[in-house]
Amino acid sequence: MTIENKQVKVQKAIFNEIKNRAGNKKSSRALVEELAQLLNVSTDSAYRRLRCEKFLTLDELEKISMHFKVSFDKHLALSESDSVIFKVALNQQNTSFDDFLMGIYTDLEKIIQHPNHKLIYSAKEVPIFHFLQIPELAAFKMFYWMKTLFQMPEYNNLSFSFDFISEKYLALGKKISELYAQANSYEIWNFESVHSFIAQTEFYFQSGMMYKQTAIALLDKFAELMTLIKKQADIEFKCSIKGAVPKGHPKNYHLYLNEIILSDNTIYAQVGESSMCYIPHALLYYMTTADKAYCDHLHNVLDGVMRKSTKISGTAEKHRSIFFNYVFQKIEEAKNRLAIAL
């Protein structure tokens, strides 16, 4: 392939990705006008770039990549080798908690904007999106992140209290949970998925970083969340803690139980004809790639896991009851341990 043909191929792929992400929400004319304004060129010149009659410069590629949140390196003919390019945050010490939350919000917003999307979440623990809709649970998870994972110095000598987390963070967390409520999602859990939160709560109490009453209150809220998720699995539709059904797709919640495979919080996202994989890295972060061969491979793997799992949403009332009875039993056992602890 000549350099010129390769550049045409890459440029077409970039604009196709932008169009796929926009879906029906942006007309071709609107995209041309947006591109013309971004590159400071005429609409005719923008059309010529879209039709690949004029090549993009490196400066224009950078502007388009930043503005439309697309990565052009994934389109550079990677199929000719076995290499996969992953995007990974290496400057984590300079990443603020605001940036961390906004990154989750932005990625999720881009995914659900497309009418043809789906998320497959192979859950090592209960997906964080669920926690964020209950303020007390969101506050604890955020405190845990900032103290234990981000290791923020100002949290070194603090014990957990519900009022330590700012309203700004809780409000953004709520928005993230509302976005996820609109997503067409497939979650793969196992019996270990619920243990993580219980273990974190007990550890904080045993380490003197949380009062007993607070730990028990958190477990009560966790039971409340599990009751909500059980209801969602029953109706296969995400709903808020108050029972209101948000905007979204009917049958947009699919829950699977796999008793053998230990998951790792890997996420596969399909957005129209494009896809993205999120691979866990450094405890809290994700490496991402949109490499088609890799994404197709992961999609096939996760599809295979779901086929070998028990679907506990929808009509599977017996299996659903067995699983959630186990969950509530583990929560009560933890509360009993806390109640008699010194």
Language-model segments: residues:
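Basic, Lys/Arg-rich alpha-helical nucleic-acid-recognition elements, primarily the DNA-binding modules
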Residues: 1-89
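Charged, low-complexity, helix/coiled-coil-prone segments
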Residues: 2-12, 40-47, 134-141, 155-172
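Short, charged low-complexity intrinsically disordered segments located at boundaries
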Residues: 44-49, 77-78, 92-98, 134-140, ...
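Helix-turn-helix/homeodomain-like alpha-helical modules used for DNA recognition
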Residues: 80-158
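Long, charge-rich alpha-helical interaction segments
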Residues: 330, 334-342
